[in-house]
A protein has these predicted regions:
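Anionic ligand-binding catalytic core segments
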Residues: 1-10, 14-119
Length: 119
């Protein structure tokens, strides 16, 4: 939701084995970020029953579908947002050039990220 993803479909989910705690849904799996001038921030898989637009309001409203209270959902959103802000450093660390990083910025940096960080 906070990173645009051109490869968004129902079979793109992964699980992590947490030892005796069992399996957990992976927080991120097979993301293919794309700048917003190439693809709008709209998901192929809807957030609720009717809508796929990337929106924190919609995500918060749908939190109950996932067994989360609003407070729990907001804590997760903020955690994901905090990690998302490290994308530039991560890209540099793996050898991305400044021009490539700047080209991809809109896939990561947008108003929803700013709002998520403020939760």
């Amino acid at each position: 939701m906070l990173i645009s993803n051109v490869d968004d479909h129902l079979r793109n989910h992964g699980f992590l084995l947490l030892g005796k705690a069992g399996w957990s849904l992976s927080p991120a799996y097979d993301l293919n970020p794309v700048p917003t001038d190439l693809k709008a921030r709209v998901l192929t898989t809807n957030i609720d029953l009717d809508e796929g637009t990337c929106s924190l309001d919609l995500l918060e409203a749908a939190s109950g579908f996932f067994g989360l209270t609003l407070a729990q959902a907001r804590a997760i959103i903020k955690e994901v947002a905090t990690v998302t802000t490290t994308w530039r450093d991560t890209a540099k660390a793996v050898g991305a050039r400044s021009a490539e990083i700047n080209r991809m910025a809109s896939a990561f940096e947008h108003d929803d990220l700013k709002r998520a960080l403020a939760l």
